Amino acid sequence: MKFDFVYLGQTVLKYQVPLEIFVGLNEIYERKKKQLPKANKQLVGKIQDEVSLFYSGPNNDKMHQHCFLPDDILKWFHSIFDHYTDWNKIGPTQKSINSIWVNEMKAHEYNPVHIHQGKLYTGLSSVMILKLPKETGVEYSAEEKPMNGRLQIIVCLLYTYPS
């Protein structure tokens, strides 16, 4: 398993996704995107096309349980979360994947700063970028190291002000 370690207070591991998992997720999304449940009501993104591939939480007015993913892809996600908790010496734990969705972002759409919550105190969340557009816009501030189209992880915001 190939991964990089980034220490930001909490551990962030960046995994290399096997090609068959990457291709499988893209194919499922492209083939079934019109029949996948809309996920907008349960997500904070300012994104028109947000659809769910997997949901195992309680049925509610926003989402019902479903699975459009084959066992091999789900097993791969479980192996990543097992590796993360083992590597960080967290355990023993009960792990369950609550949801997996796709955000198909277009120009001017974005995900605002937000948090993910779960039953495990580490708050495991994952992001996988399936496709990037060829053009991500003009890089105004750092032409030598463009950041457009990159995932930015914000660990903590601290506001200090006089009382």
Segments predicted by a language model, with ranges:
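Conserved double-stranded beta-helix
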Residues: 72-147, 152-155
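Conserved small/polar residues in nucleotide/adenosyl-binding loops
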Residues: 159-163
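Non-heme Fe(II)/2-oxoglutarate
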Residues: 1-93, 108-112
